């Protein structure tokens, strides 16, 4: 029995010795990579139980990280091929002038530890990234990002190429994403192309530029799915269809100080509002069968144009223009981004030439996803309605 216990102890000691030798080799490889790429690190620590790697105060020409923690798979250590499956980065900033930092946690498809500090990293398999910023970006501090494949190329000291396949942000599918980054001091620029799966060719382009404490974002696109666009902008889901859009945001010390949005949605629906049903109660119009079949909970439209600007926690709709097969509309309103409440005034006209002078004023208020409404029966509207009825009876 003593011999058996002694044998087990010797085997266990041999295994642990072998594993620690493997860890020493891993650390030697990491130290070599850090030296080759001129990456400054305060300390590098490896542990066996649980298998993990920790680096403190990492500094490169492109970014800095206060602390990096990587969890390793245990079994691959026996073969001398350390693989990591999760990664945590604390207080990462893109350059010394950056006004915002982030904590990033990643659950990754297992990949070789040798790639962690290499200039080119390729990931294959479902991966999840959670990003939490120190300061909110457009009202959000936390972003959840997933993808199935990724290519990260940092082989050039002042630029980078990042590609994702089957990507999704905050549960919104974005498809293929490609980012070109320029870290030339003192200016920092990034251009990102987003190409989701669409019925027709659709594309969005995100441009970011930072100089000192100021930064600017331009987000534009063609035939982009409206629901995905509104979700990315943290706007209430009130429209469907596809949109051409151009959006400009200006930041100071990472705080959003100015925003302008122009969105032209086409061939979609206003969700949760049936304008045709509302109007049919007041307009002396006979709707044909083709129009009545769409009398459901939504309003089908051909075009919906929004011109908005950001004012503190509100989006001010300077101009709203609507075109449906039966109606034309013009209006303006306010969206409270904290409460997700809307207050919109819109005047509806018939597309019938005989009733162009009749404008039905409607006020929508309350929850943007299921608003209440009231008809503003002004003296002007009453006179217009009487004139329209007289015209119809002639």
Which residue ranges define each predicted feature?
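Small-residue helix/turn framework positions
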Residues: 52, 56-59, 84-101, 105-110, ...
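Terminal hydrophobic membrane-targeting helix
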Residues: 15-98, 362
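Hydrophobic membrane-insertion alpha-helices, especially the h-region
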Residues: 5-19
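Extracytoplasmic/secreted proteins and extracellular or luminal domains
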Residues: 37, 61, 80, 122-123, ...
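Short, flexible N-terminal segments of the mature chain
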Residues: 148-152, 286-287
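Extended beta-solenoid/beta-helix repeat architectures
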Residues: 27, 31-32, 38, 102, ...
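N-terminal secretory/membrane-targeting helices
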Residues: 2-3, 28, 32-35, 100-120, ...
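Short, solvent-exposed mixed-charge patches
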Residues: 393-394
